[in-house]
Amino acid sequence: MAITSKMVKELRDKTAAGMMDCKKALTETDGDMEKAVDLLRQKGLAVAAKRAGRATSEGTIQTYIHGAKIGVMIEVGCETDFVAKNEEFCKFAKDIAMHIAAVNPIAVSREGIPAEVIEREKAIYVQQALDSGKPEAIVEKMVVGKVEKFIGEICLVEQKFVMNPDLTVQDLLNELVAKMGENISIKRFARFQVGA
């Protein structure tokens, strides 16, 4: 199939990828727009992984207050002040602050979850599985699955994004890294709730 400039522009508008990347993705997928979007997203993951080790000493702090009852402050880091002042970068930080207000994660990543929290949940799941009368081999698999699900619910980057449940927060972060062309990281956040 012949790849037209209109197709390249449409894909570029959807993904914010470079023109040559869009043309290459359309060529590789024989003009299939959806497959090209998926291919560019996969490449975005590779770009994010390549940039992950780079220092993020610039960034922004954004806040979100919901109904004067819940407040969130978040620090999102990047490599340059050019990106730190970018409207899309700041919107990303604000959107993640709203997400935190709604979903209440306890840590940015798995590494930030206190071991005692995971051990306490694991003990509960083991007891529940044993009480159900399942064999021990199955109990272990059930517990591993439940612990993984629990981590996905309390770990910010593994949570489904509230404004688009098809993506995780990490997916959004990877897309932004690919668009901005530099490493971006969610450094930390604080969530406050009246009466909590």
Curated annotation (Swiss-Prot):
InterPro entries: EF-Ts_dimer_sf (IPR036402), Transl_elong_EFTs/EF1B (IPR001816), Transl_elong_EFTs/EF1B_dimer (IPR014039), Transl_elong_Ts_CS (IPR018101), UBA-like_sf (IPR009060). It comes from Desulfotalea psychrophila (strain LSv54 / DSM 12343). Associates with the EF-Tu.GDP complex and induces the exchange of GDP to GTP. It remains bound to the aminoacyl-tRNA.EF-Tu.GTP complex up to the GTP hydrolysis stage on the ribosome. Residues 80-83 are annotated as: Involved in Mg(2+) ion dislocation from EF-Tu. PROSITE patterns: EF_TS_2. Belongs to the EF-Ts family. Signal peptide: none annotated. GO terms for cellular component: cytoplasm. GO terms for molecular function: translation elongation factor activity. This is Elongation factor Ts. It is found in: Cytoplasm. Its main location: cytoplasm. PANTHER family: ELONGATION FACTOR TS (PTHR11741), ELONGATION FACTOR TS, MITOCHONDRIAL (PTHR11741:SF0). Keywords: Cytoplasm, Elongation factor, Protein biosynthesis.
